[in-house]
C-alpha cells in the first residue's frame, strides 16, 4: 500500500508539517500492526510507471489527488472506494454526466467493476 501525503510535495515551510505530524504517525501505527504500507509520497509522483509497479493500492488524502491520475491512466475501468466510514462505499469512477441521460451512450465498465468488487 502506498499512501500520499496531504501536502503536494510532502513538505512545508512551516514548523508544523501535517505529513510528518499526522500521516507519518498513522503509517508507523499501521506498520506496527504488520500492514505492508509505505509513505507518505508526493501525489504528483506516486502514479509514475515505476511507482505503479510497487503498489497494489494507493490511498490518497482527497479526491483530486487520486481520481485525476486514476481516470487518466485507467479511463473507465477504475472504481472509487471510500474508507473510514461505518459502511462499505464503492462507486463508479465518474460523475453522473447528465448530458448523456437517456441516450444509452454511457460506458458502464466502471459500474460493473464496482459491483464485481462488492461481490468478494
Locations of regions flagged by a protein language model:
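Glycine-rich phosphate/diphosphate-binding loop of Rossmann-like nucleotide-binding domains
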Residues: 1-40
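Glycine-rich phosphate/nucleotide-binding loop
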Residues: 26-120
Amino acid at each position: 500500500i502506498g499512501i500520499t501525503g496531504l501536502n503536494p510535495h510532502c513538505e512545508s515551510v512551516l514548523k508544523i508539517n501535517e505529513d510528518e505530524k499526522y500521516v507519518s504517525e498513522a503509517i508507523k501505527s499501521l506498520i506496527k500492526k504488520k500492514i505492508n504500507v509505505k509513505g507518505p509520497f508526493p501525489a504528483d509522483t506516486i502514479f509514475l510507471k515505476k511507482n505503479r509497479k510497487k503498489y497494489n493500492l494507493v490511498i490518497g488524502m482527497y479526491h483530486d489527488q487520486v481520481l485525476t491520475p486514476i481516470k487518466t491512466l485507467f479511463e473507465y475501468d477504475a472504481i472509487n472506494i471510500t474508507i473510514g466510514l461505518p459502511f462499505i462505499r464503492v462507486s463508479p469512477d465518474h460523475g453522473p454526466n447528465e448530458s448523456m441521460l437517456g441516450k444509452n451512450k454511457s460506458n458502464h465498465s466502471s459500474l460493473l467493476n464496482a459491483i464485481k468488487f462488492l461481490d468478494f
